[in-house]
């Protein structure tokens, strides 16, 4: 449904009250996407699937992605949005804007805005990140980030400030990846003290071109 790193690294999963590793966040589905170049036109997709849980929750999804490159300034803007209608959970809308620029051959400055609306909660959570990404070698990358997380409900709009380092390593042929993510959280509600979190994660990716099978 969502790459495990995506919501947890932005801090949104904790605001939603979920766990970093939750089987109810898994789904299986198929999506047909246009083959256009995102730097020249919108890449649109339409998909169907089922989200796991009790009960199973079928869904239909529309997605759209676009990229803008500014050659003179080297800035790049990426937009990715998707609208999902679940049978049980209702409407969900997710939007991500990524603005980035290379600093040198190995480092990139990036600003990301992420918004997630869920009809069943009648609220939207968001995060804003400022980060420096560094490519250490062909299999290893490191990111330093400041993340601000919020929600349009509750006592405070801003829920958490996060300082994060994110180490990612390709440990087997671009299929199996290892992540180590230490964080320092500064929550703004509930009189909570700052705390340290450490995430260790393995992710496996299986890719294929189904069109070759027919």
Report the location of each language-model feature.
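Transmembrane beta-strand segments that form the barrel wall of outer-membrane beta-barrel proteins
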Residues: 15-19, 30, 40-52, 64-65, ...
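Membrane-embedded beta-strands of outer-membrane beta-barrel proteins
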Residues: 28-32, 62-64, 95-97, 128-130, ...
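Intrinsically disordered, low-complexity segments enriched in Gly and acidic/Ser/Thr residues
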Residues: 115-177
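Short helix-loop boundary/capping segments
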Residues: 78-139
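Outer-membrane beta-barrel "beta-signal"
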Residues: 193-214
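Solvent-exposed loop/turn segments connecting transmembrane beta-strands
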Residues: 19-27, 49-59, 84-93, 116-125, ...
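Outer-membrane beta-barrel initiation region
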Residues: 1-38, 49-61
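Outer-membrane beta-barrel channels and translocator barrels
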Residues: 35-41, 69-72, 102-106, 135-139, ...
């Amino acid at each position: 449904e969502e790459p495990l790193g995506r919501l947890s690294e932005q801090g949104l999963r904790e605001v939603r009250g979920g766990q970093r590793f939750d089987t109810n966040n898994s789904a299986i589905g198929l999506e047909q996407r246009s083959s256009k170049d995102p730097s020249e036109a919108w890449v649109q997709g339409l998909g169907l699937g089922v989200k796991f849980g009790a009960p199973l929750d079928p869904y239909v999804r529309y997605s759209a992605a676009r990229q803008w490159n500014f050659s003179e300034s080297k800035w790049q803007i990426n937009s990715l949005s998707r609208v999902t209608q679940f049978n049980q959970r209702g409407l969900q809308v997710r939007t991500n804007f990524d603005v980035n620029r290379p600093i040198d051959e190995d480092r990139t400055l990036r600003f990301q805005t992420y918004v997630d609306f869920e009809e069943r909660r009648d609220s939207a959570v968001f995060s804003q990140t400022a980060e420096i990404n560094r490519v250490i070698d062909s299999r290893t990358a490191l990111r330093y980030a400041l993340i601000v997380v919020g929600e349009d409900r509750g006592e405070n709009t801003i829920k958490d400030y996060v300082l994060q380092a994110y180490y990612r390593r390709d440990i087997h042929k671009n299929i199996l990846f290892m992540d180590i993510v230490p964080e320092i959280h500064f929550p703004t509600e509930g009189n909570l003290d700052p705390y340290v979190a450490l995430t260790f994660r393995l992710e496996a990716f299986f890719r294929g071109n189904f069109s070759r099978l027919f």
